[in-house]
Amino acid sequence: MGSTQSVSGTPARPLPRNKHVSRVADPRSPSAGIQRTPIQVESSPQPNPPAEQLNSLKQAQDPDPRSPTLGIARTPMKISGPDSQCPLVKELSEVFETEVSETEVSESISSPVLGLPQETPLSSELDLPPDPDPQVSLEDQLLPWSQTELNSKQVFAKEEAKQSTETMVSGQTSDKPSRDPETPQSSGSKRSRRKTNNKVLGRSPLTILQDDNSPGTLTLRQGKRPSALSENVKDLKEGVILGTGRFLKAGGGAWEQNEDHDKENQHFALMES
């Protein structure tokens, strides 16, 4: 068989060499010859910036305590200088201060003149006699109010008593026979109604509970109506049958319907076949 180590007979071909791909670390990249990314682009030589620009950049990159991310100055810093106020604001503030000072001076001048009439009421108050007893005066003022309240309460109680007596008398004297006996009432009213019905009608209390719709009582709607057949049977029993097919009632009643037809037939001769 063969040996353990196999050696190729043909020499290996060298890798293809491309001048664009020679600078790329990984030649398997699809964009090997296209310089797109900053990694692939060679750094161009840049001139050194002056020292003034470096200082300005450092000042701009100073951490802003108001920024949520330190090292990034996003909001502009407020310039706080000695002359930050507008000249118009200064003028207005000065005018306002002068007006306030003038008003204070005028008030201080007018205060001694106005002091005399303020003291005059004090002398008039001293002339008035003091109240002898403040508690007694308060009680005197409260007495008429309490008396009026008591009078109103008494009148209200009397009116309520009158209304209650009137309702009791009207409930005892008034009788309502048209009211349905099954309607709910108090026990006293039920007993009084049953007693009066027993005396007047002479029936037992159970008969009061029977209405028109109860099965125990017969009304005109529930009664039996006489039928035509029953009337004919009665007529046959009471009447006398004649030979011509018509009958006359025993009491000499009226002729039946067949009578008219028989009268018409009497004018013509009977045909015998």
Swiss-Prot record:
UniProt KW keywords: Cell cycle, Cell division, Cytoplasm, Mitosis, Phosphoprotein, Ubl conjugation, Ubl conjugation pathway
Pathway listed: Protein modification; protein ubiquitination
Chain ranges for the short sequence motif KEN box as given in the UniProt record: 263-265
Keyword Secreted (UniProt): no
Entry-annotated residues carrying Phosphothreonine: 37, 75, 207, 217
Any one of the GO BP annotations: protein ubiquitination
Polar residues bias (residue ranges): 32-45, 144-154, 164-175, 210-220
Region feature (F-box-like): 90-124
A cellular-component GO term for this protein: adherens junction
Intracellular or extracellular location(s): Cytoplasm, Cytosol
Cited function: F-box-like protein which is required for entry into mitosis. Acts by participating in E3 ligase complexes that mediate the ubiquitination and degradation of WEE1 kinase at G2/M phase.
Protein name: Cell division cycle-associated protein 3
Source organism per UniProt: Rattus norvegicus (Rat)
Taxonomic lineage of the native organism: Eukaryota, Metazoa, Chordata, Craniata, Vertebrata
